[in-house]
């Protein structure tokens, strides 16, 4: 079985259950009276680690917060290792565009750039994604069913689906759904806080205001804009303007910091959280444990709009 395949988990207790991560957590809840799902709504993200820990130490069943903390740390290590593996293998041209009819294959980075710049598909940066093959298969199945990725409106054919997604700017994943959470590494860092930064927070965030099952003329531009408090003062701005405000008024430029220190998106998230918490403009030394501690990936401000819009700012050459 490939490391990109879904994992089958066996119950660590005296029963014959074997299933996927969501079924396993449900099994622990209903059969073994576990509270892990109540404590952490995304406990399934570290389900295999929970099973491993309970196999090694069944007494952790009565210390569920500790169990979740250990499992979260190990699951984060797992997906970071997996992502490194995918990056190495991603240099090979093995990915097919989901929209083009030609048979040309792309490497990992080419696929993300092509999908975004040619088709406008915005699922975030390559650095955010793990289990890429399963993610693309899931997206492909949705498209082949002629269902919109964002609002799930059914269309009669491929042509109408493309027209709908173009008109509505729906070449992105549903920001209200958690079904893609397992493919975004940042979610593995926030399991025990019951805070889920979903795929929508690494794409252009636009509220959905649709209930009709048919194509409508409602424009997403009517959505109320996000507002966020400045990192260094109490003023509120839309995220892009907040980054500009920090650059001009507070001499804190996230794009310059990212470039000067060769940071990926996770490094930039760490810096945002660090500056929010400490109010410092300088960042820790390269050898500091700060760069390895998973806790700095967890937002200091829940649903921080600066993190939500980070990829948009990073990719925008005008900013």
UniProtKB/Swiss-Prot annotation:
A zinc finger (C2H2-type) spans 146-170. Keywords: Metal-binding, Nucleus, Zinc, Zinc-finger. GO terms for cellular component: cytosol; nucleus. It is found in: Nucleus. One of its GO terms (molecular function) is zinc ion binding. The keyword Ribonucleoprotein does not apply. Pfam families: zf-C2H2_2. Its main location: nucleus. PROSITE patterns: ZINC_FINGER_C2H2_1 (PS00028). Belongs to the ZNF277 family. This is Zinc finger protein C19B12.07c. It comes from Schizosaccharomyces pombe (strain 972 / ATCC 24843).
